Amino acid sequence: MLTYSHQNIDQSDIDTLTKALKDEILTGGKKVNEFEEALCEYMGVKHACVLNSATSALHLAYTALGVQEKIVLTTPLTFAATANAALMAGAKVEFIDIKNDGNIDEKKLEARLLKESENIGAISVVDFAGNSVEMDEISNLTKKYNIPLIDDASHALGALYKSEKVGKKADLSIFSFHPVKPITTFEGGAVVSDNEELIDKIKLLRSHGIVKKRLWDSDMVELGYNYRLSDVACALGINQLKKLDHNLEKREEIANFYDKEFEKNPYFSTIKIKDYKKSSRHLYPILLFPEFYCQKEELFESLLHAGIGVQVHYKPTYEFSFYKKLLGEIKLQNADNFYKAELSIPCHQEMNLKDAKFVKDTLFSILEKVKKGYCG
């Protein structure tokens, strides 16, 4: 099966893990700091805190910003953790509709803030598929209204916005090291920031809220969590980070092939990356034309049967039964239509152009046989 994304584990990673497993300290050691320093150097930021997942990173980011009893404005087109973690931190969640690239609509965000901005605890944006949001416009809004900004850049490690690494402009930025991302620590995540006070707070909460006073004594000053990332995982992360730019180049090669081959086809559109951005290509979404919406399940199953592991990103968060019970029925037209249209096809560093051609040929062959027809 040619999956929509795939980890890159080579002999250097295996050797790194073997060495780390033989160390005296498997967790809470120097590899944690080394990984954080490597991330800071790569990102061009001052501070980083690595954690056991991006969900944990989001939870502590919201908590550090003090969103309890306030509203977090976010996108519905994301993995549920973006909103879930805000609820875990005691916030209320409100969804803002998206644009046709899958990113939050900054104009609709501005319209919401014009209505009322007093009780907004944070704005949390997602760089969908690795393609940056319009960060200048969004950052200007958050500064105008004095609202903290979280960039859930879980898709976007290594992506660029106006020649800068994605993750530099927000108060707190989140990254994921899940195996489907360009680098992995098995599970894992990070928060990065130039704000030392916020990162110190997150590091405290990461390990039970405990500080050491003396060699044999400690004090718990906050109610914290066990969100630590092990030294073994961090050792892998350090080695993976060395390969990140190469992995991104390979993903870009596959994406560029698709862009050219899919141009002006009669079945679907693709997302165009603006010339002042560079996507990490975490995903390669195709957006089916409306006459194929109701055939998407048939298309999905046919592609799986042909050995192409597609996926859908994402069901809008407000469509989950939990959120329907919490918030009632919500309809955001662009997010709803994006969900009907979207399929993510294989695009990752383990592929070659022969694989990409197989995906293209198979996709077109199946679509030619699918009967067009609008729903209803």
Curated annotation (Swiss-Prot):
GO biological process terms held by the UniProt record: polysaccharide biosynthetic process
InterPro entries assigned? DegT/StrS_aminotransferase, PseC, PyrdxlP-dep_Trfase, PyrdxlP-dep_Trfase_major, PyrdxlP-dep_Trfase_small
Does the record carry Metal-binding as a key word? Answer: no
EC class name? transferase
The entry lists its GO molecular-function terms as: pyridoxal phosphate binding; transaminase activity
Keywords (A to Z) from UniProt:
Aminotransferase, Pyridoxal phosphate, Transferase
- Pfam families in the record: DegT_DnrJ_EryC1
Chain positions recorded as substrate binding sites:
Y4, E24, I25, L26, T27, A54, S176, N226, Q311, V312, H313, Y314
EC id? 2.6.1.92
Q: Which reaction does it catalyse?
A: UDP-4-amino-4,6-dideoxy-N-acetyl-beta-L-altrosamine + 2-oxoglutarate = UDP-2-acetamido-2,6-dideoxy-beta-L-arabino-hex-4-ulose + L-glutamate
Q: Which residues carry this modification: N6-(pyridoxal phosphate)lysine?
A: K181
Q: Spell out the NCBIfam families in the cross-references.
A: PseC
**Family affiliation:** Belongs to the DegT/DnrJ/EryC1 family.
What functional role does this protein have?
Catalyzes the second step in the biosynthesis of pseudaminic acid, a sialic-acid-like sugar that is used to modify flagellin. Uses UDP-2-acetamido-2,6-dideoxy-beta-L-arabino-4-hexulose as substrate producing UDP-4-amino-4,6-dideoxy-beta-L-AltNAc.
Put simply, this protein is called UDP-4-amino-4,6-dideoxy-N-acetyl-beta-L-altrosamine transaminase
Q: Which gene encodes it?
A: pseC
